[in-house]
Design a protein with these regions (language model features):
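Carboxylate-rich, polar loop motifs that coordinate divalent cations or form catalytic acidic clusters
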Residues: 1-180
């Protein structure tokens, strides 16, 4: 009986000691009142630059650890026809450019140095009849894979100046042979 009591006592003592070994976690909630452009955050990315990037219902937002910065087009500053809103996914390529997929399946490139958006429509349309982007994913070497609605698969990358290069990995369009 004394053995059982001793083991139970030691077990309870050890669990109590282990509970104190964990550091206190501080959880902060960020809302529109604290700087987010919208309370709906669809995706996040920790960039190579250390910033945390948020894709929100109202557009792109960065956080440097102390303050938020929204990249909207209220002042007409950004070069894209319509800056991305309703962002669904953000990935970063090897050169630090952000590839942004929106809920309406459009694709944008964000240049962090110049704080400019580029609609990637013209770069994709020669490879796919349906330019709606279903999924974006980075590869181990920093390229970006793009899956279109018609199931074409593209591999994209940027150079140091932001010029986009695309290569088609899979063409879903059927081969059409024309005979006289």
């Amino acid at each position: 009986m004394k053995k059982h009591f001793f083991f139970i006592f030691m077990f309870l003592l050890m669990t109590r000691i282990c509970a104190f070994a964990y550091p206190n976690m501080i959880v902060e909630h960020y809302t529109a009142e604290r700087g987010l452009p919208n309370n709906i955050v669809n995706c996040t990315l920790k960039g190579q630059d250390g910033f945390v990037w948020f894709g929100t219902w109202y557009g792109l937002c960065s956080f440097d650890g102390t303050k938020f910065r929204s990249y909207d087009n209220h002042d007409g500053f950004y070069s894209a026809d319509i800056p991305p809103r309703k962002i669904q996914r953000i990935v970063e390529d090897r050169n630090g450019y952000l590839w942004i997929k929106t809920i309406d399946r459009k694709l944008y490139l964000f240049d962090k140095k110049h704080e400019s958006f580029h609609a990637v429509y013209d770069d994709v349309k020669e490879y796919s009849e349906n330019i709606q982007i279903i999924k974006i994913q980075t590869t181990d070497d920093g390229d970006v894979l793009l899956l279109t609605k018609d199931k074409s698969l593209l591999r994209a990358n940027t150079d140091q100046n932001g010029k986009i290069t695309m290569k088609q990995l899979h063409d879903s369009r059927p081969n059409v042979n024309v005979y006289d």
